[in-house]
Design a protein with these regions (language model features):
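Membrane-embedded helix-loop-helix hairpins and adjacent transmembrane boundary segments
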Residues: 1-520
Length: 520
């Protein structure tokens, strides 16, 4: 290693030591009982609730995936995705947060999402609990793999090591930390990591813009690429059979402008629908100490989200201007943040900025693994297999499950040509369509019953797979993001099945009215 690489490594090691320290600090408290381990004893303040919710939501996708999209094909895809996410974030905090916090207490003090849905409908056979836990295991394992891909790309790009080896090192660190501290440690570190992420974004976009000659120069140079700065048109890189962009006279080659229809806009904005079913965000709503503090949390979260999304998109544009031919495949384009940091900053500062990517990855992957493990340990092991299991047994089963899920995620992440944005988009659609409609109808429609809930979950998840793997291949209007049709289909199934089957019991309707009136 040269001296620059050593300095970057030192900065990142310091950061990781601080994160491990947080895990050690909270480990004793996390081992008290399962509510402390999985939900932090419902003790989160407004700042930690807001920042940890958004940091765990965004992941390395924010610093690598989203800038990579803007770098590869320009403003349209990245902007409409970011816009949809900002709107979805606001609506989730406005509509869902307060009522879910209240309802989760009313529903037998539920501490996981599957447990909430099961208790909400007072089911005895625990079918909803089993199904929702199973879907969480599937989609979060896929989600966690995207974080491991981020680790592999980050470390192999910085230190020149083999991708698989670097990915395994990153996964091992994430796993160790998550097993150690539980939800409270995860939320506390996510708060710190949210700060690191937004500082890293601010530093890179500022340095990059100055290096390019200022904002005016960035925009003028970007306009030279056909469709690059259009909202209703998209730049089209000309690629060879291997998917590598062609270069002529030192400049990357672009074809004509790809049309961007209103349907495509709606498809990209549909990312915002995913928030209503995103467990890592919904659990923060359940974990805040007082529902009255959610309004303040919403404001904090929105400021963070709008700034971070806007800056991430602009980093991709700045990167294309400064390093137009540095990354010639869609997968490699996701390294533009790393390129800007290592080429524009002193090594020690670049190391701390790189810690921003590590922060984003850790803040998400620990959430994904912890929630998936809790779904199995709390809702399948204790909920169905061994109902008299002690808290200590539940926590040990959770930790073993963490290890198994991480190993599966590692297998998925072995392909170094994986595109982070594409992995995240599929898992995001899975959660959004499986749990989003059910969450909204559970909170706001009294007539929703157990049969409708099951139909909504199964139909939403099935449609995501069907649309992604089969229908989207037809092209044209069918090439839209799978979340949109799956979300709509799930809503229809909930309504139709609920109306065709027996109304909820008197007790369930009384619970609903008590939550709506605030008399919990």
């Amino acid at each position: 290693m040269d001296s620059s690489t050593i300095q970057i490594l030192i900065a990142m090691v310091i950061y990781m030591a601080v994160v491990i320290g947080i895990g050690v600090l909270y480990a004793k408290r996390a081992n008290k009982n399962s509510e402390e381990y999985f939900l932090g004893g419902r003790s989160l303040g407004p700042w930690v609730t807001a920042m940890s919710a958004e940091a765990s939501d965004m992941s390395g996708w924010l610093l690598m995936g989203l800038p990579g999209v803007a770098y590869w094909c320009g403003l349209a895809d990245a902007f409409w995705t970011a816009f949809g996410l900002a709107v979805g974030t606001y609506l989730n905090w406005l509509l869902v947060s307060k009522r879910l916090r209240r309802y989760s207490v009313r529903a037998n003090n539920s501490i996981t999402l599957p447990e909430f849905f099961s208790n909400r409908f007072r089911e005895n056979k625990k079918v909803i609990m089993l199904l929702s836990a199973a879907f969480i295991l599937v989609f979060f394992t896929v989600y966690a793999s995207s974080c491991f891909v981020t680790c592999g790309k980050l470390f192999s790009t910085l230190f020149g090591g083999d991708y698989v080896t670097m990915m395994l090192l990153g996964a091992a660190f994430v796993l160790l930390y998550t097993i150690l501290g539980g939800f409270l440690a995860e939320s506390a570190s996510d708060f710190m990591q949210a700060i690191v992420m937004i500082v890293a974004l601010a530093v890179i976009v500022t340095i990059g813009t100055v290096s390019a000659g200022g904002l005016g120069e960035v925009m003028n140079n970007a306009k030279e690429i056909p469709g690059f700065l259009e909202f209703f048109g998209m730049a089209t890189p000309t690629v060879n059979e291997a998917g590598q962009q062609l270069v002529e006279a030192g400049k990357p080659v672009f074809g004509g402008v790809t049309d961007y229809s209103i349907l495509t806009v709606c498809s990209m904005m549909a990312w915002g629908l995913g928030y209503f079913g995103m467990p890592q965000v919904l659990l923060r709503f359940m974990a805040i100490r007082k529902e009255e503090e959610l309004k303040r949390s919403r404001r904090i979260a929105m400021i963070w989200v709008v700034i971070s999304l806007a800056v991430a998109v602009f980093i991709g544009i700045v990167g294309r201007v400064l390093y137009s031919d540095a990354h010639l495949t869609k997968s490699a384009a996701e390294n533009i943040f790393i390129t800007l940091a290592t080429s524009s900053l002193p090594p020690i500062l670049a190391g701390f900025v790189m810690a921003g990517i590590l922060a984003a990855t850790i803040s998400s992957s620990d959430s994904y693994l912890l929630i998936a493990a809790s779904a199995f340990a709390k809702n399948i092991f204790q909920g169905v297999c061994k109902k008299d299991a002690s808290d200590k047994q539940v926590m040990w089963v959770s930790r073993i499950t963490l290890l198994v899920l991480a190993l599966i995620g590692i297998v998925i992440a072995l392909d170094e040509n994986s595109v982070i944005f594409q992995i995240v988009s599929f898992a995001w659609a899975g959660f959004g369509a499986t749990f989003g409609p059910l969450m909204l109808f559970s909170l706001f429609w009294k007539r929703t019953n157990r049969a409708g809930a099951i139909a909504g979950m199964v139909s939403g998840a099935a449609m995501v797979f069907l649309w992604k793997l089969v229908i989207s291949k037809l092209g044209g209007v069918f090439a839209i993001y799978e979340l949109l049709p799956a979300f709509v289909f799930s809503c229809l199934c909930i309504v139709v099945v609920s109306l065709l089957t027996k109304a909820p019991s008197k007790e369930i309707q009384e619970d609903f009215e008590a939550v709506r009136s605030g008399k919990v």
